């Protein structure tokens, strides 16, 4: 049996915010991208245990989560995210919040066919900025109101 070779370069996607007119390509292996991690934050099951040990499972609705985008601190992608963040903060500080959670992200890994769509995306905060002898990677953390993965 032969395995399938993984390549981050087979990741293709896009980040868009139609309110502010931003389109940022997300392509693995390009533009200083170091990695992407998707994390669901809603537990889908809760269990209540009665005094006699009877377990009552409950299904919990929700599809929200987080997305970490790790980039080189001098990358084009970092600059694009920083520009979008600053634009949205400036608008929000002027009471224009229409664009704050209007970002959408979709990407696919061509090798295995997995597709992820995130909507209602907003920035958690500006990432920490390291200053060291050598350039570093920084991680942008975004929150998504809805994540679908196929």
Predicted regions and their residues:
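Solvent-exposed edge beta-strands and adjacent loop segments
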Residues: 1-76, 113-141, 149
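Short, conserved charged micro-motifs
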Residues: 76-82
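Short, acidic/charged, Gly/Pro-enriched secondary-structure junctions
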Residues: 83-117
């Amino acid at each position: 049996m032969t395995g399938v070779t993984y390549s981050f370069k087979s990741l293709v996607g896009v980040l868009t915010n139609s309110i502010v007119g931003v389109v940022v390509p997300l392509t693995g292996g390009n533009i200083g991208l170091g990695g992407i991690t998707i994390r669901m934050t809603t537990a889908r099951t809760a269990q209540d245990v009665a005094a006699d040990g009877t377990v009552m499972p409950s299904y919990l609705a929700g599809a929200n989560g987080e997305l970490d985008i790790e980039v080189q601190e001098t990358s084009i992608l970092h600059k694009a995210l920083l520009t979008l963040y600053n634009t949205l903060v400036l608008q929000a500080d002027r009471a224009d919040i229409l664009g704050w959670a209007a970002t959408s992200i979709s990407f696919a890994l061509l090798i295995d066919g997995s597709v992820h769509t995130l909507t209602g995306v907003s920035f958690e905060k500006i990432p920490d900025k390291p200053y060291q002898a050598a350039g570093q990677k920084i991680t942008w953390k975004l929150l998504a109101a809805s994540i679908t993965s196929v």
